[in-house]
Structures are given as structure tokens and as C-alpha cells.
């Protein structure tokens, strides 16, 4: 019988915040690279393809995180396993983690360690901005010429004679 991780019917923001605050209090407080005044902050979570997606900043890192969503059953995975996911922002590599009392989750480090010059407000704004960016559709200029497939195969660029 395989174990499965049940999804969250509502946003896990409060549980994630409490779990990271406990980690900060219990085991991270004496590390030399910690941002001295950055509190744990969790962005709002957004449902994307059935999964809860957001970002978290702590005194030691800023990460994108994904938790199982409503009616989801994730297979139990090995902590530290790597998984590549295609998000609107692009392909990102996530690592399986586990928060005591919460769930397994996927995490992609965006910044570690944090700059000590970053204010609390800047850190929280950056966390919210990153949560929006990873789910933002990429914008391109349709008037910019693109190299065709043949040009890519044969080393030619747009505008060169074939």
C-alpha cells in the first residue's frame, strides 16, 4: 500500500507560516548568515492547476512553494527529490520538502542568503511580487523577428540569406 499526501481544501498559508516560524525559533536562530530582522512571511496562495502556489521568506531564504490543492492526492516522495515543473514563468526545479504537522511540499529557492540591507517591507513586497511572477504569462513582442527552426539547425539567424 502506497502512502499519499492529501491536499488542502483551503489555503495552507496559516499552517505554513506557523511551521516556518517554529523552524526559525527552534533551529535556525543562531546561524551567522541569517537576516537579523526578517520575520517569516508567507504570500497569499493561488490555486494553479489544482495546487496551492505561493512564496515564503524567512531569515534564511526566499522560496517559491507548492502544496497539494483541494481533492489532490500526491504520492509520498523522498525528501530532497528534485522535480522540474513548467509554470507560466518558465521551467523551474523544485525540491521535495516536509513541514512537521503540515505536509510534504515542493520548494524552489529564489534567494539564499538574504541581503542584510533588505528591509522587512522590501522582503514582504518581494515575496508577494515573486508569487505573482511565477504565475504570470510571459510577454513577448510579436514584431521582433524570430529565427526559424531551419535557421536554428543550420546556425542562421533571421535576416541572413539562406
Curated annotation (Swiss-Prot):
What pairs make up the disulfide bonds?
A: none
Q: Which InterPro entries match?
A: NiFe-hyd_HybE, NiFe-hyd_HybE_sf
Biological process GO annotation list? protein maturation
Task: Write out the GO MF terms.
Answer: preprotein binding
The organism's place on the tree of life at top rank: Bacteria
> Of which family is this protein a member?
Belongs to the HupJ family.
What's this protein's name? Hydrogenase-2 operon protein HybE
Gene name? hybE
